[in-house]
Amino acid sequence: KRQALHCVDNEGEVDLEGNLKISWKYTGIELAKSIMSKPIKEIGKKVIEPMILHQNKYETDKRLREAYEEFKKLPLTTICKIARVKTFNKYSDGSSGFQTMKGMQAHVRAAYYHNLIIEKEKIHGVQPIREGDTIQVIALKPNNKYRIDSIAIRDGYMPPEFLELFEIDYRRIFEKPFYACIASLYKVANWTPPNVTDEYEFELFDLFGEE
């Protein structure tokens, strides 16, 4: 079940002023999951909640573009997908170099690439990712010498060597899961979502600006 509910009467629950407590409940959609950071969820709510209340496509499109502008200004580690590596040992043991084991999930593959790259590039001071770790998954443009399209980091630390080796694909980071979540609600409303990533270009200063 995927839904966003606007609850205007939660079994008579009231606020401090005695008014009925109005709340929102998200089930199944990305805003209800741990794959998104809290700042990203808050940006998403600024689009979704007025969308449901007012059902105005023009205003929703405007808010989605504003959300994109906010998104671009957040630190890299805030905007990336969050995941926990639960099957790392099984799939890393079954892989050899860049030939990864069939059935390996994308976030596990990104974690595996992290360890492989720090070994191949002899990057010191960066701990390998292990089974059970929580990671951030970074989308990459595949025009790098290793031809990989994602890599994971741990504890929010992006090694400078990674930035020299890889070009980060911010458009893909925005499109999934954030934009995909909003677009699914556009589909329910029978609207066509604006392609905001084609209308604007990322500014590197914003993306690597101060946290």
Task: List each language-model region with its residue ranges.
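DNA-dependent DNA polymerase catalytic subunits
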Residues: 1-211
